[in-house]
Curated annotation (Swiss-Prot):
It comes from Campylobacter jejuni subsp. jejuni serotype O:2 (strain ATCC 700819 / NCTC 11168). Mg(2+) 1 binds at residues 284, 296. This is D-alanine--D-alanine ligase. Residues 133-327 form the ATP-grasp domain. Gene3D superfamilies: 3.40.50.20, ATP-grasp fold, A domain, ATP-grasp fold, B domain. GO terms for cellular component: cytoplasm.
Length: 346
C-alpha cells in the first residue's frame, strides 16, 4: 500500500503533528509521500529527505511543489498538465483543529480520497470533550463527573479542589491546569480561556490509574494494541507525550487482571463501533475502585500509537485495504426531464 502522510494544519498542535510525521516516517518501512498543510492551509509536497525540523522552522518548505486538491486526490501544476500525487491512501496525521474536528474528513469524503482517520461524525464527537462525555454515556461507558465553564458566563457552580481544568477542544496537554485551591482558580481559567471558549472541570484524583488502549476494526474484527500504563507525574505534559509516541521512553505494559483487561477492551468496542470505522484510535481510560472510566478519545493519536502495537505495519496496511470510498449517487435528471416535457416549462 502506497501511503501519503498529511500533517501540520492550522492548530495549536501544529508542531507536534510535524514531529509525529517525522516519527512515523521512521516507523513505516515502505515508500511514502508527505503532504504538509501550513498555517495558511496550503498544501506542499515534501520530499522524504527533507522531512526534518529545519525544513519547517525556516519555512524552507515553501520552495517545494504546492499541491491542490480536487476529485480523486492531490495534484501539482506541471508545464502542460496537472500531475497527480501517486498514493493509494492518505493517513490523516493532523492533530487538533483541522485534522480532528471534521474539516479534513469532510474534505476527503467530498473529493473521494481514501484515508485513515475519523469520519465527520466521529471527529465532531471526539474533538469536543463535553460531547465525548455525552457520547460515552449514550453507549454505556462511564466518565468522571464534570462541570463546564463557558467564557463570558458567570458560573455559579461550586467547584471542589483539587480539580483539573482542560480546554474542551485541545489535546497534547495544552492549556491544562491542576488547581489545588480557590486562589489559583482565576489564573487557571485565564490560561484555559486563551485556547478555548469552553473548559471542562473534573475533580483531580490522586489515587486514579490511567491506561491507554489503541485499536481499530478490520473486516468486522477488532485489532487491539497492548494496554499501556504510562509513566507520569500528575499528568502528561507536551514533552512527555512527544517522548511516548517517539519510542524514546520505556513502554510499560499494564499489569492488570484478565477481567480488567477485558473490561477495557469492551469499553473500547462500545466507543469505536461503528462510529470510528476507518480510523486507528487510542482511548485513554481511568480505573478507580475497579470501575472503568473513559478519559478521552484520541482519534489521530501521536504517530498513530505505533509503539503500542507488536506489528504496527501489518495492522496499518490491513486497515487501509478494507477502507472503501463513499458510494456516489447517480444523478439522472429524470425529474427535470419530466418538467421540460410538460407545458409551462421550468
Amino acid at each position: 500500500m502506497k501511503f501519503a502522510i498529511l500533517f501540520g494544519g492550522n492548530s495549536y498542535e501544529h508542531e507536534i503533528s510535524i514531529v509525529s510525521a517525522v516519527v512515523l516516517k521512521k516507523v513505516i518501512n515502505q515508500n511514502l509521500e508527505f503532504i504538509f498543510c501550513d498555517e495558511e492551509r496550503r498544501f506542499y509536497h515534501i520530499p522524504s529527505e527533507k522531512m526534518n525540523s529545519k525544513t519547517f522552522s525556516t519555512k524552507a518548505y515553501k520552495k517545494e511543489k504546492e499541491l491542490f486538491i480536487k476529485q480523486g486526490g492531490f495534484f501539482s501544476k506541471g508545464f502542460l498538465k496537472e500531475n497527480k500525487l501517486e498514493c493509494e491512501c492518505v493517513i490523516n496525521l493532523i492533530h487538533g483543529r483541522d485534522g480532528e474536528d471534521g474539516k479534513i474528513a469532510a474534505l476527503f469524503e467530498f473529493y473521494s480520497i481514501k484515508f485513515i482517520g475519523p469520519r465527520l461524525e466521529a471527529s465532531v464527537l471526539s474533538f469536543n470533550k463535553e460531547l465525548t462525555k455525552l457520547y460515552a454515556k449514550s453507549v454505556g461507558v462511564k466518565t468522571l463527573d464534570y462541570t463546564i465553564l463557558r467564557k463570558n458566563q458567570n458560573s455559579k457552580e461550586k467547584l471542589s479542589f483539587p480539580c483539573i481544568i482542560k480546554p474542551a477542544r485541545l489535546g497534547s496537554s495544552i492549556g491544562i491546569s491542576i488547581v489545588k485551591d480557590e486562589k489559583d482558580l482565576e489564573y487557571a481559567k485565564d490560561v484555559g480561556f486563551e485556547f478555548d471558549n469552553d473548559l471542562v472541570v473534573e475533580e483531580f484524583k490522586n489515587n486514579i490509574k490511567e491506561y491507554n488502549l489503541a485499536g481499530c476494526m478490520i473486516n468486522d474484527e477488532f485489532v487491539f494494541s497492548i494496554i499501556e500504563e504510562p509513566k507520569k507525574k500528575e499528568f502528561l505534559d507536551f514533552e512527555q507525550k512527544y517522548l511516548s509516541f517517539s519510542g524514546h521512553n520505556e513502554l510499560i505494559e499494564a499489569d492488570l487482571s484478565e477481567e480488567l483487561k477485558e473490561k477495557l477492551k469492551d469499553s473500547f468496542k462500545k466507543i469505536y463501533n461503528p462510529l470510528f470505522k476507518g480510523a486507528l484510535i487510542r482511548c485513554d481510560f481511568f480505573i478507580l475502585d475497579n470501575e472503568i472510566y473513559l478519559n478521552e478519545i484520541n482519534p489521530n493519536p501521536g504517530s498513530l500509537a505505533n509503539y503500542l502495537f507488536k506489528d504496527f505495519n501489518t495492522t496499518l496496511n490491513a486497515l487501509a485495504d478494507q477502507i472503501s470510498l463513499e458510494k456516489m449517487i447517480k444523478i439522472n435528471y429524470n425529474f427535470l426531464h419530466s418538467i421540460n416535457g410538460q407545458k409551462g416549462k421550468l
